[in-house]
Design a protein with these regions (language model features):
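Conserved catalytic neighborhood of penicillin-recognizing serine enzymes
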Residues: 1, 5, 9, 57, ...
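Active-site-proximal helix/loop microenvironment
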Residues: 171-190
């Protein structure tokens, strides 16, 4: 079946239509479905992949691969991961550092300590659970270090980060009635 996630989304969102037209490129869609399937299989049994290609000039969706294999139940293939709420992980770190630069709190060569640090009850760790001592902001970002990012967010303020994210058109999902915490630096938001 061609582009099952895109087809299902179109029919679900416009059930009154008898004819549904999609802007997908058949060739690109087929290539990306194959690519997603091959890469997910190479990464492991429970790994999936999703791809959404949009023409920035027209807004047309050229390819919509919602999972690595629609029929693979072990990979939850029927779930369209292009629309699923996901943690942003480390993708917010450049925004955090950018806010610090704008506020004059830091610049790329500012030294920051990558050492075990507690913020009240919160004690973030690096992905590899190692510490690098004094590093520049540039190095911290290049190595996606968690502790420096949380330290900078502590100086900038989580609310300011959330405001910036909203200003670029993204509505973060926070636990109801909770203020953003330092955990948002590491993707503690959907």
């Amino acid at each position: 079946r061609f582009a099952p996630h895109a087809s299902e989304t179109e029919v679900r969102e416009r059930p009154h239509r008898n004819l549904h037209r999609l802007t997908l490129s058949r060739e690109l869609q087929a290539q990306l479905e194959t690519l997603a399937r091959e890469h997910a299989r190479a990464l492991g049994r429970r790994i999936s992949a999703a791809v959404l290609v949009v023409d920035n000039h027209t807004g047309e969706i050229l390819a919509h691969v919602g999972s690595s294999d629609y029929l693979d139940e072990a990979r939850f293939g029927a779930i369209d991961m292009t629309g699923a709420i996901r943690s942003p992980g480390s993708t917010l770190k450049p925004i955090i550092y950018g806010l610090a630069f704008e506020a004059g709190l830091a610049h790329p060569e500012t030294l920051i300590e990558d050492r075990p640090t507690r913020f009240g009850q919160y004690a973030p760790k690096n992905f590899d659970e190692d510490f690098r001592g004094s590093v520049t902001i540039r190095e911290a970002l290049a190595h996606s270090l968690n502790i420096p990012a949380v330290k900078v967010l502590n100086a900038v303020g989580p609310a300011r980060l959330i405001a910036r994210i909203r200003s670029i058109g993204v509505e973060p999902v926070l636990p109801s009635h909770e203020q953003p915490s330092l955990a948002v630096a590491l993707g503690g938001v959907g």
